[in-house]
Amino acid sequence: LPEKTTVWKAATLLAKELGAEPAVRISVTARIPERAGLGGSSADAGATLRALARLWGVNALDARVVGVARRVGADVAFFLQPVPSLYLGAGDVLEEAFPSFEAPIALVMPATNGISTQAAYDEFDRMGSEPVGYEDLCAALRAGDVRGAAAHLYNNLAPAASSLCGEVARVQEWLHDQPGVRASQVTGSGSCSFALCESTEDAERIAHV
């Protein structure tokens, strides 16, 4: 692995933090598109920390592991928690974890070069955004209410992503009109979107159009 990747940084920092011998071989099969808003490098680092924590006999939510995740970068700590969760700060302060639930999801990636995270945040700053509460969504997640959660999906970066890439807006319009889609939203800073579907069959149909 190149030494400047988030995976390398996560592994070496955790080994040092735990006093473990970093005698491990790590390979990464990249399946997450770049510039899609899916947290590719953060997800890689989070998965690395979870795997190494297990290997070295430490809980992935141990304060030392979380501390390393924060040092690696934004949102890495989020990927230490394998259940729906509310994180604050730079995606590194766990506010609440919710029960797991099953919900068929399809990802739709438009045929574009994607959107850089920095460009999305710059556009967000330019456009401005009113704060939106998340209590209704959290209440639905606590209750395992998929329909309620679908009704309160929100991403304040979505308008910026749509402004930078018209295909993002077109995908959202298309998903809105599809049968079997409970709700859809842009992932992170874009350019991918996800659809929360009624059934696995609906999700597969959306994913293979």
Kindly label every feature range from the protein language model.
Residues 194-196:
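Short hydrophobic/aromatic beta-strand micro-patches
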Residues 57-98:
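Glycine/threonine-rich beta-strand-loop-alpha-helix active-site module
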Residues 81, 86-183, 198-201, 208:
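Conserved, helical-rich catalytic subdomain that frames metal- and/or nucleotide-binding sites
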Residues 36-62, 78-82:
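DPxDG-like acidic metal-binding loop motif
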Residues 9-17, 64, 68-71, 170-179, ...:
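Generic non-transmembrane alpha-helical segments
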Residues 40-41, 186-191:
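Glycine-rich beta-strand-to-loop/alpha-helix junction loops that act as flexible
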Residues 1-36, 54-66, 100-102, 110-113:
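ATP-binding N-lobe of GHMP and related small-molecule kinases
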